[in-house]
Design a protein with these regions (language model features):
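Leu/Val/Ala/Ile-rich N-terminal alpha-helices, chiefly Sec-type signal peptides and the beginnings
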Residues: 2-63, 68-71, 75
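Charged, alpha-helix-enriched surfaces in structured cytosolic catalytic cores
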Residues: 11, 15-18, 22, 83-86, ...
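Alpha-helical transition-metal enzyme core signature, strongest for iron centers
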Residues: 27, 57-68, 95-102, 128-131, ...
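Short, surface-exposed loop/turn segments at secondary-structure junctions
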Residues: 43-51, 77-86, 114-118
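Short, charged, amphipathic alpha-helical segments
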Residues: 48-58, 86-89, 121-125
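Hydrophobic/aromatic-rich structural module bridging two neighboring secondary-structure elements via a short loop
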Residues: 56-60, 68-99
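Hydrophobic, well-structured mid-protein blocks that either form specific transmembrane helices
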Residues: 90-130
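Conserved small/polar residues in nucleotide/adenosyl-binding loops
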Residues: 141-142
């Protein structure tokens, strides 16, 4: 009696979990790339490798947006509990903003080409590592 609906419901839940895991993995990957971009920029300026990494961040951000839209569609069409739906969507939106901030900072480096005094390089690298570590902590704590 409940076999088909239950299997479908649990199947959708597993798929939703996989999509959210993919999203969190992308957030983590973008953070790791960003952690590498800052010292690369500070040491080499706007090198080809730097441009490639900025492009990589942009591609991952686009992929994360697609996953977010798919999760949103699934939640609205197939989730039975509206309160849980809004909580998950809000968390995803906030984490997507973090990816957007990473991307925005990469573009700022790429377009504006700021020149940081050498004495600040170590602190900027340390700050970027701390930011990435904080994002990692937040993303795995909330989902």
């Amino acid at each position: 009696m409940f076999g088909f609906k239950t299997e479908s419901l649990f199947g959708q839940t597993k798929q939703l979990e996989r999509e959210i895991d993919q999203f969190v993995d992308i957030l983590s990957e973008v953070g790791l790339v960003f952690k590498s971009i800052v010292p690369l920029y500070l040491n080499n300026g706007n090198a080809d490798k730097f441009d490639g990494m900025v492009q990589q961040v942009s591609e991952m951000e686009s992929k994360a947006d697609k996953i977010t839209k798919e999760v949103e569609r699934t939640l609205y069409e197939e989730t039975l509990i509206p309160d849980a739906r809004s909580d998950v969507l809000r968390l995803l939106e906030h984490m997507d903003e973090l990816i957007g901030m990473y991307q925005g900072n990469c573009y700022h480096f790429s377009i504006q080409k700021p020149d940081f005094p050498k004495e600040f390089h170590e602190d900027l690298i340390s700050l970027s590592e701390t930011v990435v570590n904080c994002v990692e902590s937040v993303s795995y704590t909330h989902l």
